């Protein structure tokens, strides 16, 4: 099982070891679902965690709220991506939608050059895409080179156990072309069971250890 620990800045990072987690998603402001951490935080986190053989996926999100970004915000995201790459990030986590809750392909294409080939993860903005469009969205993300999607299986704050069928559907459709990582209510106590129920061995959360 691959466990990704969702961390707010540096506070808990010294307590982690590679026996507990494979990867850290590094954020600021978890109270709003996570935003881009500072350059200094990213750099120090990467140095600390790389010594522990733990990889770092850095959140690129300029604010809380929706996932529809204007030109100014996209330029800020572009700069943040460049700095996150420079600071040593192993992957970048982002999510961009249109006002109709479809993938914002124009915005993705605008940001891609700045990522410099780093692995890309689409975060839980994915859950806001209508269910009947999610398979198409997976295909598009694969075409853009995304390696992983983080999903709760629903945009609602429902128990993740209520979303098992939708998560299974995504895992089956993805068929190992892109990783499906489950989150939002995954804990150290239930991760093994959820992995078996959904068919993915990749789990994410603040309480997975």
UniProtKB/Swiss-Prot annotation:
Its main location: cytoplasm. Pfam families: CutC (PF03932). GO terms for molecular function: copper ion binding. SUPFAM superfamilies: CutC-like (SSF110395). Keywords: Cytoplasm. It comes from the Bacteria. GO terms for cellular component: cytoplasm. HAMAP family: CutC. Belongs to the CutC family. This is PF03932 family protein CutC. It comes from Streptococcus pyogenes serotype M6 (strain ATCC BAA-946 / MGAS10394).
